[in-house]
């Protein structure tokens, strides 16, 4: 089963869930997860929890314990917050390149599904009649301790956007599209290194070429350990073909290490 994860603590999450039920045929069942009704359509469930999702390590085990099934993939429908309050629709995988400040464990990465994130990016961009920013975010926050692939798809970046009806519609349609298509869609995959939190060069590459990104390690986490790039490759559900570096957006020792590692592993090295 595929799982769409929502939480009652998050206005954007509830907005997206409402649109999924209204527009995409999800029906309430007699089952409960964390005390909340489970909604179902075909091979997909909508689950709701009562706390912040970024702290829900071992969610896959909780689903197995409560519902008797192991999810194939988990899509977290979430808000995005920023001080700049820029209207945005974003996607990313979770994990921590260093200390775990907001969920997950130190230097631990969730399992990325690059094709799903790229499909989300493309679909959000296609549907974006709001003229909001569409982008990847760098790998950050929890949960990191999941044994199945996952991704966050988010509405940002203030309450005005979180409750925006059209944004909820776009993300509901995006999520259903991604879950329907991701297994049959394959792209060349890269680990992304460098740039800012909103990964502008990686986003541009993904929107304009066939490249899909897995984990993205922004400049603010550099210098980056070689072991963490290896972990990012390991924690990717699809074959990794390349290491991509935003050259000017990376610290010297990290970009040189990444270039050497690509050569060592026989991966394509891509730089912008």
Curated annotation (Swiss-Prot):
MF terms in GO: D-aminoacyl-tRNA deacylase activity; zinc ion binding
UniProt cross-references to InterPro entries, sorted A to Z: Deacylase_DtdA_archaea (IPR018033), DtdA (IPR007508)
Co-factor: note: Binds 2 Zn(2+) ions per subunit.
Pfam families attached to this UniProt entry: tRNA_deacylase (PF04414)
Domain of life: Archaea
Keyword annotations of the record: Hydrolase, Metal-binding, Zinc
Root EC class: hydrolase
Swiss-Prot/TrEMBL catalytic activity: a D-aminoacyl-tRNA + H2O = a tRNA + a D-alpha-amino acid + H(+); glycyl-tRNA(Ala) + H2O = tRNA(Ala) + glycine + H(+)
SUPFAM superfamilies (alphabetical): AF0625-like
EC number in record: 3.1.1.96
GO biological process assignments: D-amino acid catabolic process
Cofactor: Zn(2+)
Role: D-aminoacyl-tRNA deacylase with broad substrate specificity. By recycling D-aminoacyl-tRNA to D-amino acids and free tRNA molecules, this enzyme counteracts the toxicity associated with the formation of D-aminoacyl-tRNA entities in vivo.
Binding partners and assembly: Monomer.
Family per record: Belongs to the DtdA deacylase family.
Record-given protein name: D-aminoacyl-tRNA deacylase
Species assigned in the record: Thermococcus onnurineus (strain NA1)
Gene name as annotated: dtdA
